[in-house]
Amino acid sequence: SRLKPSGRIGDNMKKIFSLLALVLLVVLFCFYFFPKQPKNIFDEIYQETEKTYRSNNILRNIDGFEIDDVWPSDGDYFKYSPLGKYKTLPEDYLELRVGFNFEKAYSKMFVSVERKIADGTKIWMISKYNPNTKTITKSIQIVLSGKEDSYIEDEAQVKSYLEQYGITAKDLDSYYDEIVNQKVLKDWCSIYDSKYSPSNYGDVKIETQWENW
């Protein structure tokens, strides 16, 4: 006749299976939870806004920043894309906007601002953050005002306009710092207990169009 496993062996097997199940739960928890932890200051803004934009947008707590507390949920595209703007800006700056896209295929956060460089001519600076790749892309275009604004993206033409008005890559860096670091990120740190700061972004890759101009 077959020998039945002793009670002690059966108890040991139960303990082993229980331990394995516990380890599996811990691994699954880590796999799910830790990737969602913000790796940088832009992750913080993106994730906290994603949590609140349909109920009571956290960015409404920024003084002088206008955004709907509850973003409309209709429309196939715009329902995922809250957008707000500052009412007051430093001198020579226009239309400072902060926007998002929470649709997974197009995930992003952006800061865009226009700066007047001459009558009828502006720089449009865009800083886009991709939460999937943890990358910030900084770029600029020239805007020529008219009945309808025209936008110049061609890099050679953009550089030509900048040279015409004596604007250097160092100047562009200072514009970025003044708006993104000293305005948007500083405001974020004033309403949220951030682990990061305007001088310490955290784990993020930065790509700057004008880096070698």
Identify the function of each model-found stretch.
Residues 1-12:
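Short, Lys/Arg-enriched N-terminal segments with co-localized hydrophobic residues
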Residues 10-11, 39, 118, 129:
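Intrinsic-disorder/low-complexity regions
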Residues 1-3, 57, 113, 159:
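Exposed boundary/loop context
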Residues 82, 86-213:
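Extracytoplasmic electrostatic interaction patches
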Residues 30-116:
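N-terminal export/targeting and maturation segments
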Residues 17-33:
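Hydrophobic membrane-insertion alpha-helices, especially the h-region
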